[in-house]
């Protein structure tokens, strides 16, 4: 017979992040000890950037952004060409449940593959090639936080700084160049 151990002082990280966001929105202050350490640090950086956790989408790809996208893709051509086979492999393996994104060292989105219809959901309409997902612009998110931390990052639903991203869980892995610098 399997022995069951009682769970004491268990915390639900999603509940804790919801409570932290509610307190932040109502009191203007982030309570300590409610979030995982790396999420707490990222939320504090997001606050330092002056972001509102209730900020809406920033939809739109204007003419200047289109021109910038072409330059961005050309600047990152070696990275894109090098990782395309791996992106294809990941899309093939992840099935019909998500998307795979390639970003650069500044958290600019270079490519999106997979179930792109997911992007039509509220909260993700401003996620497209050429959009920047740095912590300074979007708060805690897998792409931007992995760039800052320089290590694999999991943002589980409500741990995103922006409330509108709470339905989504995201993982990001930095791609280092031969010198160990994050290149994507």
Predicted regions and their residues:
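Short hydrophobic/glycine-rich mini-motifs in sensory/regulatory modules
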Residues: 175-184
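A general structural signal for short secondary-structure junctions and capping/turn motifs
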Residues: 92, 145, 161-162, 177-178
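A short beta-strand signature within small-molecule sensing/ligand-binding domains used
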Residues: 164-174
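Short loop/turn segments at beta-alpha junctions that line or gate ligand-sensing/allosteric surfaces
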Residues: 135-140, 146-164
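Fold-independent oxyanion-binding glycine-rich loops
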Residues: 105, 157-159, 173
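Intrinsically disordered, low-complexity terminal regulatory regions
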Residues: 1-134, 145, 154, 167
